C-alpha cells in the first residue's frame, strides 16, 4: 500500500515482478470481437491500456465458444467498471455476489493489470487506485482472452507468472 496525493494505492509486492516473464506484447486497432491472447494456462498477468472515452467488454477465463467466461465491462467515458463471474468455469457461479463494481475518474484512459491463477482474479485499475478481486474456478481449457470494442487502439502485454 502506498499513499500518493491523498489517494491510497494498492499493488502486488515487488517480488511478483521477479517471477514473471513477457510472453507477448501487442498494439492493435480493435473493431468488434477479437481474441487478444490464449495463454497455455491460467497463471498470468495481463496489462491492458485502453484509451479515454471507450466502452467495451473483456472476457477472461473463457472457452473458445464464450459460453464460460469472467466478464469485465468497462466504460472509461463514464468512469465505471463491472466484473461479473456468473458464467465462469466449473459449476457456474450462481451467487448473489457474482458481480463487483467500481468507479474511477471519467474521460481518462484506463489501465488494467490483471493477475489470474487457477482460483482467483485480481484487477488493479490505474496502477492500483482501485482493485477488484474475485474467486473463479475455470475449466483447465478456459484460457482464451477476448476483447469486444468499437474502433479503438489497444495496447496489451501478457506475462507468464512462474
Language model regions located:
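Beta-rich accessory regions
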Residues: 2-162
